[in-house]
């Protein structure tokens, strides 16, 4: 009986890392500087994002971020199964992160699907179905405003079994602590973005983020000309007709 090809752990460990020398075709085919790999990653994310249950009215279509991919690859090269420091995965905004380890070179689609499958342990609007359920990879993957993704992979030969390390970073970051159980707005697909819809996903993304949780009320009271809003509420003030 053949051994299962993939084993995934979400534990803390430090693994020495050596990059592939190019002799392993299965690994080489996963390197994310290749356009076909980037397309696979983007297409898989968008396929899953538009298939959420319940459906989402404000789910943004994802795009590839070269900057996020560079950061993800740098972290993957360290072969450590812990999340990177938030400051190390910033682009123009804060970025979230999903990690995956495999005993064999799984496809990117399989890695991404494994994150999405955490939805089986998640109830929309409520949260994890049990105290020990891990759902943060799923909620980040389907976080409505995370529209940029970049990924990297490393080969870690000194690890006994989990030799393949996958990292994806998402910008702007999802999993807001105050709204983590509602990763998107429930409703008819694209209802929140009339005129900006492609295959059930919104395309009116915002390149900025708010650094305060009460930007909308501050806008109503102080106006976007106030220095505080200029610095801390760029999305609210510059993306009126966009999703953020």
Swiss-Prot record:
SMART domains cross-referenced by the UniProt entry: SCP (SM00198)
Disulfide bonds: 190-197, 193-202, 206-239, 215-233, 224-237
Domain of life according to the entry: Eukaryota
Tissue: Testis.
PROSITE patterns from the UniProt entry: CRISP_1, CRISP_2, SHKT
Chief localisation class: secreted
Gene3D superfamilies tied to this protein: CAP, Crisp domain
The SCP domain, residue ranges: 43-170
CC per GO annotation: extracellular region
N-terminal signal peptide: 1-21
The entry's keywords: Disulfide bond, Secreted, Signal
ShKT domain segment(s): 206-239
Stated role: May regulate some ion channels' activity and thereby regulate calcium fluxes during sperm capacitation.
Protein name: Cysteine-rich secretory protein 2
Originating gene: CRISP2
């Amino acid at each position: 009986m053949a051994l299962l090809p993939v084993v995934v752990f979400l534990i803390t460990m430090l693994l020495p890392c050596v990059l592939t020398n190019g002799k392993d075709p299965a690994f080489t085919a996963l390197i994310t500087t290749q356009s076909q790999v980037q397309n696979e990653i983007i297409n898989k994310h968008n396929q899953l994002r538009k298939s959420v249950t319940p459906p989402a009215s404000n789910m943004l279509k994802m795009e590839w971020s070269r900057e996020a991919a560079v950061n993800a690859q740098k972290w993957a090269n360290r072969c450590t199964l812990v999340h990177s420091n938030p400051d190390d995965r910033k682009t123009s905004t804060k970025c979230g992160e999903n990690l995956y380890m495999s005993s064999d070179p799984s496809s990117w689609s399989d890695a991404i699907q494994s994150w999405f499958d955490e939805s089986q342990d998640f109830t929309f609007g409520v949260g994890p179905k049990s105290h020990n359920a891990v759902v943060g990879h799923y909620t980040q993957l389907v976080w409505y405003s995370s529209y940029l993704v970049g990924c990297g992979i490393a080969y870690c030969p000194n690890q006994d079994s989990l030799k393949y390390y996958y990292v994806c970073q998402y910008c702007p970051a999802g999993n807001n602590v105050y709204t983590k159980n509602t990763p998107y707005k429930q409703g008819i697909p694209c209802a929140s973005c009339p005129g900006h819809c492609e295959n059930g996903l919104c395309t009116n993304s915002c390149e900025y983020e708010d650094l305060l949780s009460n930007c909308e009320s501050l806008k109503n009271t102080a106006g976007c000309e106030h220095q505080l809003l200029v610095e801390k509420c760029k999305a609210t003030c510059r993306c009126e007709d966009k999703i953020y």
